[in-house]
Amino acid sequence: LDNLEKIRLSHLQNSGSIKGPKNENKSIVWLSYNIHGNESSSSEASMKTAYDLITKHTKWLLDTIVIIDPCVNPDGRDRYVNFYKQNRGIPYDTNQNSIEHDEPWHNGRTNHYAFDLNRDWAWVTQTETKNRINKFNDWLPHIHVDFHEQGINSPYYFAPAVEPYHEVVSKFQ
């Protein structure tokens, strides 16, 4: 932690984002969890990831800075957790139509203002996004992973990008 700012500045010099000599660089990885508060395993997964990094994979941390954002949407998560605690069945009801799986509006997916933060990256209208983008741009990580859940009947696949890339995507990215 003592060298964190030095590492960050070195990384920005290597990327060409700020002036300075290019030198040895560590990989910067940013992990975002729980942008949809009702994707409930996400924040717990962030804690497991942090634990595993410091107990099982410490060698990775010699060459990598890992930034963990454990809960991008704390308002939505809090709303979902309160809903679930009030409505869960004991024993748990796995029927998709049971009340514990049917949140009322304004559900945990959105922030306090009923805004889906996962739709705010381009427009940056929400305070949470503004602050996160500022910090993200302070680091410009090599890798960003945005963790989500998916429904059992709605899998999805995002193919890797192909050329030509958009003009605002730099060679460094």
Task: Place the predicted regions along the sequence by residue.
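Active-site/substrate-binding loop(s) of hydrolase catalytic cores
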Residues: 3-32, 40-173
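Conserved phosphate/anionic-ligand binding catalytic regions in large, soluble enzymes, centered on
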Residues: 36
